[in-house]
Amino acid sequence: MRILLQSGTIINEGRIFKGDLLIHNDRIEKIIEGKLDSVPGDLKIIDATGKYIIPGVIDDQVHFREPGLTHKGDIREGSRAAAAGGVTSFMDMPNVKPPTITNELLREKQQIAKENSAVNYSF
């Protein structure tokens, strides 16, 4: 599927400008300053007038508390909340029970994230 975010305020690479953003198969295909010259008929068009289009945010310190303290939060719900706020990647802290301080525990945590995270992750 191809999607065109049209007439938004794009913030990218230290610049701010009005433009369009073309997405193809969930990936950015093209960033256009101004308007796309010709709009193919197979596009889903989203009017982004008055909206900001920004790169995905990286949150380098989250506390999702999994494993061991999931009553406080977990990777599944925390990553979905992050995605809703524009976060595309997170770095989770090891303050869980047991603490993620061995390679084995790290592999277990990576598996949990692989099965549950809505965004990119690291530990």
Please tell me what each predicted stretch does.
Residues 38, 114-119:
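Short helix-capping segments at alpha-helix termini
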Residues 51-116:
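Metal-associated gating/positioning segment near the N- to mid-region
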